């Protein structure tokens, strides 16, 4: 590949990162070969001694070259043994120290006996069901490190996710005005919201594969580009006969969601330390919720009912502001968003990088996830809770205006309160998880209070009191929206080391499936049988979700990986053993 082409490829996949001088491979000895290279990301490396040269394997996301693992447990009951060739007694003992992106490596020759042993011991290593052993000739001093830039990365993503969320609800919250202006039905207006869900269901698997294969930057870049293009197309739709144009623009923006919706847990794991990861994930979700809050408030304030000319002017203002904002965010992503830090922020991330190198089978991971009992239950319960939230958000204007017909602007504030309370719930939930690590208990309690909030909202909306509507909207939003990042983190724990982007992508797909089904069905029920009936059905769904959550087993595999134990027996053998508590991860 030419120099310019390689530079462009690296810039797209990794961003504006500093290049490091690669370390040349160590020359092989007569009895064995030692091979290792440095990576631009400074990730942990493993190496081995063998009778033949080592074939490195490449990880596309980081463009790092890593040797194949010496021993890899696959869940069989039998142990696997390995042996290393005897090195020359006259080999050079002078150690060399390199610093690669904050990771120190000391090269020392290995003196080991030949042969192997089934049970391990001095001359070999074994591998059983519950652990695997990495044999390395170099002592690695890996010091996980977090960088201040992680906050810049997180804030840029929050702006991107927020700009996408704001456009999701901008038509539905003024459904009566949009319906009159474009001369379309309320169901057509509802589809401007549901198209987000439909495009995600159709394309989330390719998007999850893209994130797993090529990393954060490319996914975020495509999401920002789609937001920008769709926003400018919608600016061309400010004419009563142009609903199809605005729908095309909204479809492009909705499709862009598939590149960003599953990012928060992946970004948190890649950039943040073990004591920050839940909060970082919560803040990533917080950005999307903040955008939805803006989508609830700004359209009713900017676009008011009136003549065709008046509505045209207001829509122009709304769409132009959105287009300029999304163009600015695209520029920020291009200039400042990088794929990963130079050094992994946690031991779990170091191990995840090695797992990705050894087992880079996206479809195999997908199959394992969908055959995991605990993940399948979480897949269903997450979809129920989030689907109910999507249905309420889309139908909120029609729910409230059916009882309070003159409160068009107030509806926007009700939606704002739901989302703002939910943002607070997301952050509080993240702090609780980081502090106490009680994932299952926290999930059950939030699910239970989501049901209480929904039931209270259902029973008070007809009491002719907007104060009660606001109070119950806050209660509903705090718990229901606060559930979103907690579900992501719970999934990351019980499926570790599966890529966080894959697990969150599946959870979001479940949310879109339930969301589109509940929005469509509850819209029919609401217009046919009334708001009370539709809300009771959604409350019943939350009861089912709460009960199902109790059957999820709390096996926090990622927390175990944070405390992985590494021992270096002697400087003579340089035999490094890393023992994990669990090998069959999910």
UniProtKB/Swiss-Prot annotation:
InterPro entries: FLVCR1-2_SLC49-like, MFS, MFS_dom, MFS_trans_sf
A GO molecular-function descriptor: heme binding
Chief location bin: membrane
Gly residues bias: start-end ranges: 112-123
Polar residues bias spans: 28-37
Annotated spans, Disordered: 17-64, 80-123
The UniProt record lists the keyword ATP-binding: no
Annotated localization: Membrane
Protein family: Belongs to the major facilitator superfamily. Feline leukemia virus subgroup C receptor (TC 2.A.1.28.1) family.
Listed name of the protein: Uncharacterized MFS-type transporter C09D4.1
């Amino acid at each position: 590949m030419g120099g310019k082409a390689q530079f462009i490829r690296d810039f797209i996949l990794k961003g504006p990162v500093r290049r490091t001088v690669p370390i040349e491979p160590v020359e092989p000895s007569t009895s064995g070969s030692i091979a290792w290279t440095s990576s631009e990301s400074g990730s942990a490396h493993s190496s081995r001694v063998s009778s033949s040269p080592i074939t490195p394997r490449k990880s596309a996301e980081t463009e790092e070259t890593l040797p194949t693992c010496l021993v890899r447990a696959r869940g069989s009951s039998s142990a696997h043994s390995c042996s290393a060739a005897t090195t020359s007694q006259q080999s050079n003992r002078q150690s060399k120290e390199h610093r690669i992106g904050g990771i120190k490596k000391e090269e020392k020759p290995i003196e080991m006996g030949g042969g192997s042993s089934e049970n391990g011991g001095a001359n070999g290593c074994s591998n059983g069901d519950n652990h695997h052993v990495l044999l390395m000739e170099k002592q690695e001093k890996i010091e996980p490190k977090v960088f201040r830039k992680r906050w810049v990365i997180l804030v840029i993503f929050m702006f991107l996710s927020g700009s996408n969320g704001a456009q999701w609800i901008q038509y539905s919250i003024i459904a009566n005005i949009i319906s009159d202006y474009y001369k379309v039905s309320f169901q057509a207006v509802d589809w401007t919201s549901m198209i987000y869900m439909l495009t995600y269901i159709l394309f989330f698997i390719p998007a999850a594969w893209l994130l797993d294969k090529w990393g954060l930057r490319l996914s975020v870049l495509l999401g920002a580009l789609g937001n920008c293009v769709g926003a400018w197309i919608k600016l061309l739709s400010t004419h009563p006969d142009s609903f199809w144009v605005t729908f095309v623009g909204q479809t492009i923006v909705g499709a862009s969601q598939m590149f960003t919706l599953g990012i928060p847990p992946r970004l948190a794991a890649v950039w943040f330390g073990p004591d920050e990861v839940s909060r970082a994930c919560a803040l990533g979700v917080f950005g999307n919720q903040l955008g939805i809050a803006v989508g609830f408030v700004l359209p009713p304030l900017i676009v008011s009912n009136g003549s065709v000319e008046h509505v045209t002017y207001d829509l122009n203002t709304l769409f132009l502001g959105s287009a300029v904002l999304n163009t600015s965010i695209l520029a920020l992503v291009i200039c400042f968003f990088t794929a990963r830090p130079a050094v992994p922020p946690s031991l779990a991330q170091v191990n995840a990088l090695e797992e990705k190198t050894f087992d880079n089978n996206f479809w195999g991971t997908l199959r394992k996830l969908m055959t995991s009992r605990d993940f399948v239950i979480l897949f269903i319960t997450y979809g129920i809770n989030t689907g109910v939230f999507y249905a309420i958000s889309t139908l909120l204007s029609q729910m409230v205006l059916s009882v309070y017909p003159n409160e068009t602007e107030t509806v926007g504030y009700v939606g704002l309160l739901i989302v703002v309370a939910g943002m607070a719930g997301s952050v509080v939930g993240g702090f609780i998880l980081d502090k106490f690590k009680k994932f299952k208990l926290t999930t059950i309690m939030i699910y239970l209070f989501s049901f209480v909030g929904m039931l209270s909202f259902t029973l008070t909306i007809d009491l002719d009191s907007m104060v009660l509507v606001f109070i119950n909207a806050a209660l509903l939003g705090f718990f229901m929206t606060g559930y979103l990042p907690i579900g992501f983190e719970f999934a990351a724990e019980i499926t570790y080391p599966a890529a966080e982007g894959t697990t969150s992508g599946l959870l979001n797909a479940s949310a879109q499936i339930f969301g589109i089904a509940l929005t469509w069905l509850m819209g029919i029920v609401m217009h046919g049988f009334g708001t009370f009936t539709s809300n009771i059905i959604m409350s019943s769904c939350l009861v089912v979700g709460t009960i199902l959550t109790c059957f999820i087993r709390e096996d926090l595999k990622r927390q175990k990986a944070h405390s992985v134990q590494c021992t270096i027996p002697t400087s003579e053998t340089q035999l490094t053993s890393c023992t994990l508590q669990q090998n069959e991860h999910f």
